[in-house]
Amino acid sequence: LFCFFAEDVGLLPGRMFEGLVNNRKLTSDKLTGGLRNLFTVMRDGGLYGNDDIPWFNGGLFQKISIPSLSVMEMTELRNAASLNWSAIDVSIFGTLFERGLDPSKRSQLGAHYTDPATIGRIVEPVLARPLLQIWELLVPVLQALLAKSTKKGDKHYKAAQVKFIGWLDLLRDYRVLDPACGSGNFLFLGLKTLKDIEHKSHIEAATLGLEREADLVTGPHNMLGIELNEYAAELARVTVWIGELQWRLLHGYEFKTNPVLEPLDHIECRDALLAFLPGPIPASKLPLPQGEGRGEGSPIPVEAAWPKASVVIGNPPFLGDKKMRAELGDAYTEALRKVFAGRVPGGADLVTYWFEKARAQIENGGLRKAGLVSTNSIRGGKNRVVLDAISKSTRIYEAWSDEGWVNAGAAVRVSLVAFGNSMQSAVLN
């Protein structure tokens, strides 16, 4: 899929990929070999036939394993290659991926599709609005300094330039974490929002009289993710890569080279809630029930660490108490409750653990804001304890308590909650 896109935006020369898959003289084995050769060159850069292929890197082609292709699969490849993939809506990747999963595991894997409008209700108050407020406060400062400047390079111009570079440094170092990223819908919109804000500031700074910077400082490095399913995590990386390339194409920026793709190791494939330290320890000391198949030398469950981020956004998986045991197992469920004892009450929905972890990071000063989607059951019962803890240590400043939404083909009611360090007036419907 990435190669379809890369070819249609000019990163691969001369309809090379389409020509390869459309060569009807190739047997399945020869086509597989041709794809393997192309992917190897894309990984390292260099000649493929007479064409010079850019160094793509990024990790997408790190492990090259091409499955055998049936006649029907080769036909489907040819049909797909005939389409124009340059304007593919990367937000549909989640839906495509979800349909390939066992429906009973969709909630557990967290790979359900969230429409852009819903994501926007989280991204706007948590990411976009606070950054735009910082920029809007900086603009009159730049205006005042440049009004005193008589020529480029004088002390007032340099002072304005330093202020603007400070703003760009803030954007460059900004980190957006989705700790249940699925196939990357929230990360894609977060990246687009950051780049839109930076682009706007470059245009306005140039209008004020500052020299235009050559390139942007925001990019895939700003996006952090955690996802349990390996395939979903890889799709999230592809979503971010294509989102970056599409944005640059749309706004007239050249593609980066050497490499074309930034490594996205910071979109991690692992559990966002629990980590397991190696044993050995006596089975009697394990924070798991006896008889769960974990004896001498079993790993010790501890709270999983999240990478340092500026904000957290996301749509954690929806699992109630009984479904947690059915889908995650008794041992995992008991371990989770013991590790978070005193913070998340037993019997609370799975999604509340993400809320509590975000709250704790805000309280410890490592995180500014968070915006998460939950089922509307978070408003009451044992789930409510987590919201009360958020209100005590920080504040909920924007929320939608009962919104319609579709998950795994079923209509559900959700709550969207933005909380953290914000001075904005509360918007609570």
Please report, for each region that a protein language model flagged, where it lies by residue.
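Short mixed-charge
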Residues: 136-167, 198-216, 245-263
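Signature of N6-adenine DNA methyltransferases within the class I
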Residues: 10-18, 25-32, 37-40, 117, ...
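Preference for the N-terminal adenyl/adenosyl cofactor-binding alpha/beta module
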Residues: 2-195, 222-232, 239, 270-284, ...
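Positively charged N-terminal leader segments that act as targeting/secretion signals
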Residues: 286-289
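Short acidic (Asp/Glu) and glycine-rich catalytic loops that position anionic groups and cofactors
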Residues: 72-77, 99-103, 217-218, 266, ...
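Glycine-biased, low-complexity coil/linker segments
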Residues: 291-293
